[in-house]
Amino acid sequence: MDISLESLWNQILERLQLQLSRPTFETWIKTATAEAFTEDRLTIRTPNPFARNWIQKYYLKTIADVAHDILGHPVDVQLVIAEGEETPSSEETDLGFAFPPLFRNPSPAPAPQRERMSDLNPKYVFSRYVVGPNNRMAHAACLAVAESPGREFNPLFLCGGVGLGKTHLMQAIGHYRLEICPDSKIFYVSTEQFTNDLIAAIRKDSMQSFREHYRAVDVMLVDDIQFIEGKEYTQEEFFHTFNTLHEAGKQVVLASDRPPSQIPRLQERLCSRFSMGLIADIQPPDLETRMAILQKKAEYENIRLPREVIEYIASSYTSNIRELEGALIRAVAYISISGLPMTVENIAPVLTPTTAKLEASPQTILLAVSDTFGIPIEDLKGNSRRREISVARQVGMYLMRQHTGLSLPKIGEEFGGKDHTTVLYSCEKVADLQRTDPEIAQTLRQLSDRINLASRQTEN
């Protein structure tokens, strides 16, 4: 096959972009360049030895397979290192990534308590947490850890659905420790931030500084640890960070929407370590607990609520505390603007659209995605791997999972008989993009609003 180096490399990049997650592609593949190409050999230049070793270990076969598909015959892929790359000085102070404020520009004297708490939400304290049958064990475990970190439950693994108070409890531990021991080094970080800092450290060749910062803590609070799934190097680095802290008797608290054993593509050794302490499950609150949550929220906001209003809102929102509190805010805002008295009859209209859980039809979703992306429905159901079609198809699968009760195999059938693993991969990829790409996130919000509106109109 007669093809130029530039054309071959562009085609390889295009296909790899579809196969790999965005952070993986931009960190490892996009930074590489095609150096030379003969009939049976492709030479790729990497920016540094670390990148070469990483691509060699995890992505070389994928690149070779893609090149084989394009050329129609096997090709030997060689990796070389760019010449003249300067190694940053060990005294370099600009690491190229933002650590949480606790670690940025440390001074010899201890920082004031308020600076150490700058990454913690001041509202997330134990005194503002409503305890019920659904979260009693998790609350007790967090309080025990806050009083005696690194002893009974280490690590402490909190698991539960979205909006059930995991982050509140984690940060309450941090506030409690700082209150009784102001010099404690408390580190609250999301898994996404850990990954982003790691990527930036690799690019700047600042891994030693990265490790020193992440391992010089007394209590490490890591949120949304489920997002570590499938990120091999992040898992590798977190494994060693975890071991360092645990062996030093430092407390580690993790939060996830599922237990360790149910996190896909999680290294077995990490799963084992996450499970070696206490796993505390948080369930959706019952009616009495939901009413207590609303009452406490109203008290802190100095809002007077009739009992029947509290009971109405608590009965309408059963699974998510964020939605529960959001409904209260909407109701109060509406009454404040309208000047009407706070009654069930007056707030019901503003809560009903959100309360009603409408299920969209697959056709409604296909039409919305087709119109938004300008892609015919038959192409969404087809097998084209053109980037614009693939992205639209993946978004459609994600929205169908969000807005219908269809199983993964059934969603695959709606898209021309795709395998359920393809649907799962698409949903995970779009979920990743939603967190990292503001444009995709906005498109998803607009599509969801459009789908919900169409579903309500159909119901009416």
Swiss-Prot record:
Keyword annotations of the record: ATP-binding, Cytoplasm, DNA replication, DNA-binding, Lipid-binding, Nucleotide-binding
Compartment(s) where it occurs, according to its Swiss-Prot or TrEMBL record: Cytoplasm
Source organism, top-level taxon: Bacteria
Stretch list, region Domain III, AAA+ region: 119-335
InterPro entries: AAA+_ATPase, Chromosome_initiator_DnaA, Chromosome_initiator_DnaA-like, Chromosome_initiator_DnaA_CS, DnaA_C, DnaA_dom, DnaA_N_dom, DnaA_N_sf
Region called Domain IV, binds dsDNA, residue ranges: 336-460
Start and end residues of each stretch annotated as Domain I, interacts with DnaA modulators: 1-75
GO biological process terms, semicolon-separated: DNA replication initiation; regulation of DNA replication
Region (Domain II): 75-118
Single annotated GO MF: ATP binding
A GO cellular component annotation in the UniProt record: cytoplasm
Annotated residues for binding of ATP: 163, 165-167
NCBIfam families linked to this entry: DnaA (TIGR00362)
Record's subunit section: Oligomerizes as a right-handed, spiral filament on DNA at oriC.
Notes on the domains: Domain I is involved in oligomerization and binding regulators, domain II is flexibile and of varying length in different bacteria, domain III forms the AAA+ region, while domain IV binds dsDNA.
Protein family: Belongs to the DnaA family.
Function of the protein: Plays an essential role in the initiation and regulation of chromosomal replication. ATP-DnaA binds to the origin of replication (oriC) to initiate formation of the DNA replication initiation complex once per cell cycle. Binds the DnaA box (a 9 base pair repeat at the origin) and separates the double-stranded (ds)DNA. Forms a right-handed helical filament on oriC DNA; dsDNA binds to the exterior of the filament while single-stranded (ss)DNA is stabiized in the filament's interior.
Name of the protein described by the UniProt record: Chromosomal replication initiator protein DnaA
Organism listed in the record: Cyanothece sp. (strain PCC 7425 / ATCC 29141)
